[in-house]
Amino acid sequence: LILTAKEGLAIDLCSGGNRAERKVTCLVDGDTGWERGVKWRLLDIDTPETFEAECDREKQIGEKAKLRLQALMAGGYRLADSGGKDRTSERRYLMRVILSDGRDAGQVLLREGLAQRWPNKGNRWCGR
């Protein structure tokens, strides 16, 4: 799978259905998005859940992670395909988001405390 770079475009937050059919580009949360109708997940990191959060703190940090990823990608990015898919039923493409300045967006989220390594056990945001 090859997806080209985007230069300085605002990335929408996802809404509505039929994203593959509509070929949308948007962010679901801090580690999942769609690029022209292809669903992807960030490789090697996990951000807090926003839809099925186990505690309020997880939801709050998850929202921060999503907005931070949106801001990072707005400066331009490219998706680097790892060649793999996740093991969930969704079979999302595992990608790295490489920012226009060469940084890996996932690593930025890790350094800022908005993500943890993936796969992992437990939920550090809810104290377990």
Task: Tell what function each PLM region has.
Residues 1-128:
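Small beta-barrel nucleic-acid-binding modules, primarily SNase/OB-fold domains
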